[in-house]
Amino acid sequence: MGRRILLGSQLRRLRESRGITREAAGYSIRASESKISRMELGRVSFKARDVEDLLTLYGVADEAERDSLLGLAREAN
């Protein structure tokens, strides 16, 4: 569960630094605002596709950073 919390907090930091609402983030992955909240709190598992879509929305273009976060998502599940 520690990895879920770590990944969730990193996703929240990225979302907030870009000024994106939970609602907009949820819309981008076909989910609710509450699912984004649960993801950011580490309470649910992560789908690689959702993490990829969120990273794109949040403007994370650096391949090393993307790979690191996607690897963390795989390990968190």
Predicted feature descriptions by range:
Residues 75-77:
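N-terminal low-complexity or simple alpha-helical regulatory segments
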